[in-house]
Amino acid sequence: PQGTMSHYMTYSGLLMLVICTAVARLLFGSRNRIWPALVMPALVVALSLTLSRNAWIGACAAVGLLFLLKDFRLAWLLPVILAVLVVIAPEGFVNRLTSTFNAQDPSNQDRFAMIEIGAKMVRDHPLVGVGPNMVPRLYEQYRPDYAINKVNPHLHNVPLQIAAERGLPALAIWIWLIASLTTSLFRLFRRQPDKILSATALAAVVAMLAAGLFEYNFGDSEFLMLFLVLVTLLVALPIYAAVARSEEHTSELQSP
């Protein structure tokens, strides 16, 4: 299933971020928790049906973080929930899940090949990379014999893709950006009494990073737009509220 998206991985990435939002509302919200409770089962089923392992990993990492942020004693819930899902899940889901740990799985073999290809590209072009959108064009030049696919559109790994396309300095800047963002969000989480938005943003970052080790989600425009909304909403809302108050005050002064 891919919903209304062009690819099932885009769809699963968006579902992963929505799950972050719903779980954060359930754990940290004091009101309006009915709708996330109602949609959570549908979100979990929809994400499971995509058979997208990177999104499963990202969602689990994000939910685990939210449990820890709420109360570290809740961390034991995650393996219990996963165990229940595995028990009640259909055979196709279980097979897809267990294939994650099978080094002989064709999909996994191709991922190993992509890591090798990306490393060679970085070795040959460490400063500026091979250039934006050039990875698929040069793929066959670096492709090892054991690779499954003749060409892949990207390397299915965010840090590796950035380094291969744009060089190690660009990767360093990206790491600095994510580290600064995470530090700022955690600081806001500790300071603010209403923690829903900051918890959602932190979960979105962790989900992106965990899933991004197996998928180039940072280069997916639909995923990136929702991700950026979630991580900046915490800062944008107070600014919007201040502007609204200022406009309201100006309107009152101008009224006869």
Where are these regions (language model features)?
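Membrane-interface micro-motifs in multi-pass membrane enzymes
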Residues: Q2-L15, A163-G167, F218-F227
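Alpha-helical transmembrane segments of multi-pass inner-membrane proteins
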Residues: G3-L69, W76-I81, I88, W176, ...
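A membrane-periplasm/extracellular boundary helix in multi-pass inner-membrane enzymes
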Residues: T50, F67-N108, A113-D124, P132, ...
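Short "domain-exit" segments at the C-terminal end of structured domains
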Residues: E252-P256
